[in-house]
Amino acid sequence: MFRRFHYPISDTIKKDMWILDFGLGDFAQVGMAGIFWLNRQDCNYFGHEIYLLPGQMIPEHSHLPTAKGAAKMESWQPRRGMIFTFGEGDATPELLGKIPISQRDLVKSRRCNPLEIDQVGHLNRLEAFHFMVAGPEGALVTEYGTFHDMVGLRFSNPKAKL
């Protein structure tokens, strides 16, 4: 996918990129790869690249406050491909079919906002449940956010885990 998108595969990416199926055993449908470029508690900011296969979903989740910091706020910018971001609000029934069947009955977030290359979408409120699904080509997404303490991460799917 990186080669198809003409994305440079640096030594840092080769060394530090991680790949997750969230313990669900269905990586092609529900999973992600990525790299944390920075996660600064002292300055309260975070930089992350998300790598998604075509139609792949990050499990629905929220970020709660912890002893180390406030709930995480985040924004997303597709750099290659496109994504469907799902969050709270009025449902967009015409786009619910983008959610993998294995997750469709488990998610709370039913408001979809498609994002094309270089459009930026945002979490609509702190602690809101949300997720994204890659478009048909897959997606490389830059995520901007406040400090991320993994202790505050909560999944709506009780089987999902890091």
Predicted segment positions?
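A short, N-terminal "cap"/entry segment at the start of jelly-roll beta-barrel domains
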Residues: 1-46, 102-105
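Intrinsically disordered, low-complexity segments enriched in polar/charged residues with Gly/Pro
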Residues: 22-24, 35-38, 62-64, 99-102, ...
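A short beta-loop-beta micro-motif enriched in histidine and acidic residues
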Residues: 35-47, 60-78
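Short, solvent-exposed loop/turn positions at domain surfaces
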Residues: 46, 72, 109-112, 117
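Glycine- and acidic-residue-biased ligand/ion/polar-headgroup-sensing regions
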Residues: 53-54, 71-93, 97-99
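Double-stranded beta-helix
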Residues: 90-110, 129-162
